[in-house]
Amino acid sequence: MTHQHPYHLVDQSPWPLTGAISALMMTSGLILWFHTNSNHLLLAGTILLLLTVINWWRDVIREATFQGSHTLPVNTGLRYGMILFITSEVCFFFAFFWAFFHSSLAPTVELGVSWPPTGISPINPFLVPLLNTAVLLSSGVTVTWAHHSILTQNRTEAIQGLFLTVILGIYFTGLQAWEYYDSPFTIADSVYGSSFFVATGFHGLHVLIGTTFLFICFLRLITFHFSNNHHFGFEAAAWYWHFVDVVWLFLYICICWWGS
């Protein structure tokens, strides 16, 4: 029977269930890792999450690109969904900034009535953090270049721009890992270490997710999945990447520069 409406009624799928199970395994595994030094459940949850993501994305790409299920109303719904998702992420990071300023604007006696707390040697904001800022802002330029090239049907420049964006994302992650390795304090060193590593660590996780998202778009672009008027998968990745850029600017200004 043919449905006389433009909406996509998805088939039954196991991926929401396996995704929820993997989230439970990863969070429980993280707690076990912290308390018992056993990471088996965490690794199993991560593997299940990767399998879920790969298969779910495969299904969505098939429905969108090969079955034509993503009509204009469906695309509009996906846009609203992505906007709501990014809004929820804004609230997520707002909580980290709240925790940071709650501790830094009125340091307690336990912290030595100073910020950074007594005994903490902060990271120089004009070395690796400043380079990271330049790298991430440059990646924002290259992803915009790629988007403009898709709109103007310049496929070669779109591929070049997206490839550069992925490389810059990987470079940022490498620099962040190096900064963590050389850090003079740890996540256990007072509320300064906790707020610094949790906020920048979750941002780094979002950079990894965004880089993966853009890499999938890069593979789709070179296999002719995008046109100048139908490329929301790329647009969603670009929105997410710009969000990651803006969050890093606030992290750099507030935590790396002002907080040091």
Curated annotation (Swiss-Prot):
PROSITE patterns found in the cross-reference section: COX3
Primary subcellular site in the record, as a coarse category: mitochondrion
Keyword annotations: Membrane, Mitochondrion, Mitochondrion inner membrane, Translocase, Transmembrane, Transmembrane helix
Gene3D superfamilies per UniProt: 1.10.287.70, Cytochrome c oxidase, subunit III, four-helix bundle
GO BP, one annotated term: mitochondrial electron transport, cytochrome c to oxygen
Molecular functions (GO terms): cytochrome-c oxidase activity
Coiled-coil parts of chain: none
Any Pfam family: COX3
PANTHER family in alphabetical order: CYTOCHROME C OXIDASE SUBUNIT 3, CYTOCHROME C OXIDASE SUBUNIT III
Subunit structure: Component of the cytochrome c oxidase (complex IV, CIV), a multisubunit enzyme composed of a catalytic core of 3 subunits and several supernumerary subunits. The complex exists as a monomer or a dimer and forms supercomplexes (SCs) in the inner mitochondrial membrane with ubiquinol-cytochrome c oxidoreductase (cytochrome b-c1 complex, complex III, CIII).
Protein name, as recorded: Cytochrome c oxidase subunit 3
Gene from which the chain derives: COIII
